[in-house]
UniProtKB/Swiss-Prot annotation:
Disulfide bonds: none annotated. It is found in: Cell membrane; Endosome; Cytoplasm. Residues 168-244, 251-270 are annotated as: Disordered. It comes from Bos taurus (Bovine). This is Sorting nexin-11. Residues 135-139 are annotated as: Important for membrane trafficking.
Length: 270
């Protein structure tokens, strides 16, 4: 009887999709092509996703492309709006924070639509670090790896660093957690994500992204290997979704420091 009860509970388990847009950073700070990007962390138990946990960085321009593609493929199904390009806010920091909140609201609405959720471009946008041309090549059959394989390859590329990160984890105080869902890549090493916030793990236990082998394949032929591992930044696990996210600039070696609001004027619209 207990066995059948457990089966019934599993069948009735509610699907949950959690998405967070956070940690805005100015990339290529000081150059003509500087821009702001955002970390997108996704954790789910839905069978619609190949990887149950993922972490990528995307810029506003890529969100604009994604919305156009979703609208093109969705037909009469409405696609949520993106935050506008208006700069009528009190400061540059406030503008970026408003945009971050708007981008998160956009993704939350998109992920509530069954039609939009079936678009393979959305999955590659959220669960791989492929560029826009690489995503287009993948869904159009002009690359050698399938959509699901591309997502799996990106997920598995974040499983390294086990030996290196054990030492760092052992020095954390009780209750502390690593400060990122995706570690910045180090030369010669692959990056490794941390367990989802709030989930207690043995600091010496190797954690890897959960992959659903029974997830329905996303219909699309293939793409080339990902050009680079995850570049998700260091975000504190206690950063709330509504809390203001400090803007950072990326310097040599993968470190980040707060950015003077006056330096953001040339990168807000990119």
């Amino acid at each position: 009887m207990g066995f059948w009860c457990r089966m019934l509970e599993n069948q009735e388990q509610e699907e949950v999709i959690t998405v967070r847009v956070q940690d805005p950073r100015v990339q290529n700070e000081g150059s003509w092509n500087s821009y702001v990007d955002y970390k997108i962390f996704l954790h789910t138990n839905s069978k619609a996703f190949t990887a149950k946990t993922s972490c990528v960085r995307r810029r506003y321009r890529e969100f604009v492309w994604l919305r156009k593609q979703l609208q093109r493929n969705a037909g009469l199904v409405p696609v949520p709006e993106l935050p506008g390009k208006s700069t009528f806010f009190g400061s540059s920091d406030e503008f970026i924070e408003k945009r971050r909140q708007g981008l998160q609201h956009f993704l939350e609405k998109v992920l509530q639509s069954v039609v939009l959720l079936s678009d393979s471009q959305l999955h590659l946008f959220l669960q791989s670090q492929l560029s826009v041309p690489e995503i287009e090549a993948c869904v159009q059959g002009r690359s050698p790896v399938s959509v699901s394989d591309a997502i799996l390859r990106y997920a598995m590329s974040n499983c390294g660093w086990a030996q290196e990160e054990r030492r760092g984890s052992s020095h954390l105080a009780e209750g502390d957690q690593p400060k990122s869902c995706c570690f910045l890549p180090r030369p010669g090493r692959r990056s490794s994500p941390s367990p989802p916030p709030g989930e207690e793990k043995d600091p010496f236990e190797v954690w890897a992204p959960v992959v659903d082998s029974e997830a329905p394949p996303l219909e699309s032929p293939t793409l080339p290997p990902t050009s680079s591992p995850s570049c998700c930044g260091f975000a504190r696990p206690d950063e709330g979704l509504s809390a203001s996210q400090p803007v950072r600039r990326v310097l040599g070696g993968g470190h980040a420091v707060p950015l003077d609001p006056g330096q953001l004027e040339t990168v807000l619209e990119k």
